[in-house]
Amino acid sequence: MSESSSKSSQPLASKQEKDGTEKRGRGRPRKQPPVSPGTALVGSQKEPSEVPTPKRPRGRPKGSKNKGAAKTRKTTTTPGRKPRGRPKKLEKEEEEGISQESSEEEQ
């Protein structure tokens, strides 16, 4: 039984070598090495004079997890002194925040 299975796998491997395309497992295919523009054919290039646009990263940048609040909210501070850390909420600010939420619900 085991002999027949090993025989069947050998011809398949030889066919793949003849085709020139190696098929690996079901996982993600390997990234092809980048081809330098000097070795590529000049006739195959569509726009040789225009510089191709660089690829932009997808999704959220790595270091931007906790930076959203710093950009959106500007605090007024006394000149010459920079407060560090999270600002403390005053009781008045908390009450104003609650009243604003209730007024939005009514509209």
From Swiss-Prot:
The modification Symmetric dimethylarginine is found at residue 26. The modification Phosphoserine is found at residues 9, 36, 44, 49, 99, 102-103. InterPro entries: AT_hook_DNA-bd_motif, HMGA, HMGI/Y_DNA-bd_CS. There is a cross-link at residue 15 (Glycyl lysine isopeptide (Lys-Gly) (interchain with G-Cter in SUMO2)). The keyword Transcription applies. Residues 15-24 have a biased composition (Basic and acidic residues). Residues 55-74 have a biased composition (Basic residues). The modification N-acetylserine is found at residue 2. The keyword DNA-binding applies. Belongs to the HMGA family. This is High mobility group protein HMG-I/HMG-Y. It comes from Homo sapiens (Human).
